[in-house]
């Protein structure tokens, strides 16, 4: 793949290139390329489904009902070791730019311009990370500039649709608007990474006179205010309307169906809530389950549309979540905190498996063998080159290095790009309450081994993931050679990509580098 780095990259020039590219595309070539749907769920844990991604069913799999995830898995391939970042913004910025979070430095969640969102510390000075997010154009401080794969799709003849959560850039920055990323249609996407409410009775976060009462108010759904339609359903209906229009165009489409579900608040989706109460779940857990099934219904509605419109055989569907399930805030879930993603340890915000391992499925008729599982690992930035390769785009230019590696060989069964490959995460931030693997740490996964390093204490933990999926047995003392080797590799990667680390306020000295 030829990815030349450009010295500068202007959005205006992209528009011109896009027009020329579309003129060159013949209708015959366009029709041969698949439609692509990336169905991204917010804060969905590895166990938040009736589809078992582990080797055995858990009580969570028994409690939840996601028949359309099961339906999709029958048509495609389940990935049991698909990784994202531990926080939404980091994942979505890696997705859209193909850069690892150590490189783009959007390591915590973003919202307001020029404002970091970290919880303050009396002893630790956090790095000046990119809290304004990512952008395709220069000129905004604390912003990573990268080339959008969606823009490349658009240049090469794809009709591009965004529906739901964006969370690429802070308020009043170029990156907050999905149309600045190559999306021709934007439905309800803006800077916020959450939502005020799923309820139309509250106008999704707006007062009666139409003013948002929260920065998390969902824009663009005014037609649904007061209708009794849950936000997940409203977004689905709008996505289907956009697909109805797209079908009239003589070009393939890319739909980024990026649900706000199942992010807090855990509002009750009354289409499903009573059923879970009858199943014996508590009020909180039944509400959480209703969010999950509402999301699953959306997936089924899109699959039904594809079948009804004779597009199912020519459409790739990728199902993914942006980080682990919420497990650190007792106000929204019942049960002991940090356990809601078991057998995985911890949850959202953590570099343990519960915070970064995601439920992922890929369906591609004629390419991916139906009803199969892949136990090889991959990471979110790999979606960038893979989706472009799916679209037949292999020769392109970017302003930033692409850290992702195509997982097409895994889809086709022709190779294993994960063998001997290191995956890296960096979180020199303080997200929320402390917990297992949460705050001020970095990590590397290579083959069966995973090292977690804590900046503040210098502690190193080593886990054999295939043998210890719950990360309960730290074997660092038993394998000092592996700890040393992974520490060096992680340290070298952080230096090479500009990975940041905190400092001590008292001395001004940087916290100990992992390889020091």
Residue ranges and their predicted role:
Residues 21, 38-39, 46-147, 152, ...:
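Active-site segment of extracytoplasmic enzymes that catalyze sulfate/phosphate-ester chemistry
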Residues 53, 78-99, 107-114, 162-174, ...:
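Short, solvent-exposed turn/loop segments enriched in Gly/Ser/Thr/Pro and often Arg
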Residues 185, 190-193, 325-353, 368-376, ...:
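C-terminal cap/loop subdomain of S1 sulfatases and analogous C-terminal strand-loop tails that border
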Residues 111-159, 166-251, 259-268, 282, ...:
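Formylglycine-dependent
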Residues 32, 60-66, 83-87, 118, ...:
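A short beta-strand-to-alpha-helix junction
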Residues 230-247, 274-315, 332:
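A long, amphipathic alpha-helix that forms part
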């Amino acid at each position: 793949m030829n990815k030349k780095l450009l010295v500068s990259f202007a959005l205006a020039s992209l528009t011109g290139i896009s027009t020329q590219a579309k003129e060159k595309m013949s209708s015959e070539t366009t029709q041969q390329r698949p439609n692509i749907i990336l169905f991204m769920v917010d804060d969905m844990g590895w166990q938040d489904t009736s589809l078992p991604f582990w080797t055995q069913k858990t009580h969570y799999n028994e409690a939840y009902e996601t028949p359309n995830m099961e339906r999709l898995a029958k048509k495609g391939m389940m990935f049991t070791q698909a990784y994202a970042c531990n926080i939404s913004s980091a994942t979505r910025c890696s997705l859209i730019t193909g850069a690892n979070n150590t490189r783009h430095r959007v390591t915590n969640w973003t919202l307001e311009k020029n404002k970091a969102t970290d919880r303050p510390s009396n002893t630790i000075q956090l790095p000046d990370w990119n809290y304004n997010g990512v952008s395709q154009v220069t000129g905004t401080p604390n912003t990573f500039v990268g080339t959008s794969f969606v823009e490349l799709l658009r240049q090469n003849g794809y009709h591009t649709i965004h529906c739901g959560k964006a969370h690429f850039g802070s308020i009043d920055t170029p990156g907050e608007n999905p149309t600045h990323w190559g999306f021709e249609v934007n439905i309800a996407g803006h800077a916020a990474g959450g939502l005020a409410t799923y309820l139309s009775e509250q106008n999704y976060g707006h007062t009666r006179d139409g003013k948002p009462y929260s920065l998390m108010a969902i824009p663009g759904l005014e037609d649904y205010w007061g209708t009794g339609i849950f936000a997940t359903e409203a977004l689905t209906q709008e996505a289907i309307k956009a697909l109805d229009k797209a079908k009239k165009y003589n070009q393939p489409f890319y739909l980024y169906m990026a649900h706000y579900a199942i992010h807090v608040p855990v509002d009750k989706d009354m289409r499903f809530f009573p059923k879970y109460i009858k199943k014996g779940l508590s009020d909180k857990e039944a509400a959480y389950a209703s969010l999950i099934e509402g999301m699953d219904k959306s997936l089924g509605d899109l699959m039904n549309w594809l079948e009804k419109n004779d597009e199912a055989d020519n459409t790739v569907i990728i199902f993914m979540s942006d980080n682990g399930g919420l497990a650190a805030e007792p106000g929204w879930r019942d049960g002991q905190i940090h356990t809601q993603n078991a057998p995985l340890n911890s949850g959202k915000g953590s570099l343990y498996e519960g915070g970064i391992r995601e439920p992922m499925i890929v369906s591609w008729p004629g390419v991916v063998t139906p009803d199969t599982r892949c136990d090889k690992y991959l990471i979110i930035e790999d979606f960038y080159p893979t989706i472009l390769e799916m679209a037949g785009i292999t020769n392109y230019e970017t302003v930033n290095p692409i850290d992702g590696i195509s997982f097409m060989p895994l889809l086709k069964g022709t190779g294993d790009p994960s063998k001997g490959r290191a995956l890296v995460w960096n979180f020199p931030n303080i997200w929320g309450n402390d917990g297992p693997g949460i705050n001020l740490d970095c990590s590397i996964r290579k083959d069966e081994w995973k090292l977690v390093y804590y900046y503040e204490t210098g502690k190193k933990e080593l886990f054999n993931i295939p043998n210890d999926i719950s990360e309960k047995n730290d074997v660092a003392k038993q394998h000092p050679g592996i700890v040393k080797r992974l520490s060096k590799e992680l340290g070298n990667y952080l230096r090479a990509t500009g990975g940041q680390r905190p400092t001590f306020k008292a001395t001004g000295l940087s916290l100990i580098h992992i390889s020091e």
